[in-house]
Each structure stands twice: as structure tokens, then as C-alpha cells.
Design a protein with these regions (language model features):
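A compositional/biophysical signature of low hydrophobicity enriched in polar/charged and small residues
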Residues: 1-171
Length: 171
């Protein structure tokens, strides 16, 4: 069963492109995308390999960086965080680094990205209530301007990226 360990750095002789050219590896990735907790024996059965062979392939995909990790998805509302928002931040002069540090220090900020455009950061914030969301925003207002958008519903839930097409079989 896949675990949450961090993948090892890519070995010099492993090329993500060559691994992705293999249709069996693409099938492994598709199955893991549907169910990251699948047992290696079941994964092997689905792609036509033994458990040790499919385990080795999955580990190679991890080592070369194609598989970046396995993640647990939690329901924020079930954990007491029904308020979800995206917040854009435009730092004041000289405050760029401080915004990134502040975002990293606030547990309710679950993602923060440096972006192009008028704002410099976009982040995902969860809170138990609007007043607590406002308290998070107030921390950023010390260092710049914020623009927030409360999430009403998810039109598309997080999902795996599309995989490259399998190459045609060699003749």
C-alpha cells in the first residue's frame, strides 16, 4: 500500500519522459490517481504485473519525481472549518518576504503561492466563522492590502492532472 513518505531524489539514469512513454506506467498512474491507497497486489492485478514488479515501477516513478507524494484529503467543514476563501495579497513596499513568512505561520492558511499580476500572493484560508476569518485577514493588513473571495461551492473538486497519451505500440 502506498505510504506518505517523501520520494527520494531522482537517480541520474532515470528520465521522467522515458518512464511516461511506457503505457504500463501510465496505467499505474491512472490507478493511483483514482485510489492512492490501493494495495500493490491489487494494483499489479489491474495492470498485469506482480506485486513486486508494480512496487518497483511505483518506486521508480517516485524517485524520478513523477509521483510527488500521496495525500490525505480532509473535509474542512467536518473538522469545524466551514468558511473557505481565497485571499489575494498585495504587499506594501519591502513586505514581500514578511507576507510569505506570515502565511507559513498561520495554520488556517493551507496554501500560499507567489503569483504574477497586481497582487503578489494568493492563498487558501479556512476558518470556523467569518469573524475568525476576518482576524486572519487583519494579520495581513499590517503588511499590505487583501482581496478575498469566499467559496460558495466546489464546481470541480481537486483531481489528478490528465496523463499523457500512451505511445502507439511498436510494430
Amino acid at each position: 500500500m502506498p505510504n506518505n513518505r517523501q520520494p527520494r531524489p531522482a537517480a541520474r539514469d532515470e528520465n521522467p519522459g522515458s518512464l511516461l512513454a511506457d503505457p504500463i506506467n501510465l496505467r499505474i498512474l491512472a490507478e493511483l490517481g483514482r485510489n492512492p491507497r490501493i494495495a500493490m497486489s491489487e494494483l499489479g492485478r489491474r495492470v498485469g504485473l506482480s506485486a513486486p514488479a508494480v512496487t518497483e515501477r511505483a518506486q521508480r516513478l517516485e524517485r524520478c519525481g513523477v509521483i510527488a507524494g500521496y495525500r490525505l484529503e480532509l473535509d474542512p467543514a467536518a473538522l469545524g472549518y466551514p468558511v473557505s476563501a481565497y485571499v489575494r495579497v498585495r504587499p506594501g513596499p519591502g513586505q514581500l518576504r514578511r507576507i510569505a513568512e506570515l502565511a507559513a505561520s498561520i495554520p488556517e492558511v493551507t496554501e500560499c503561492y507567489r503569483i504574477t499580476g497586481e497582487d503578489c500572493f494568493i492563498m487558501r484560508v479556512y476558518a470556523p466563522a467569518i469573524d475568525e476569518f476576518e482576524a486572519v485577514l487583519d494579520k495581513f493588513l499590517l503588511y499590505g492590502q487583501t482581496t478575498s473571495s469566499i467559496v460558495q461551492s466546489a464546481a470541480v473538486r481537486p483531481r489528478s492532472l490528465p496523463l499523457p497519451a500512451a505511445p502507439p505500440p511498436a510494430r
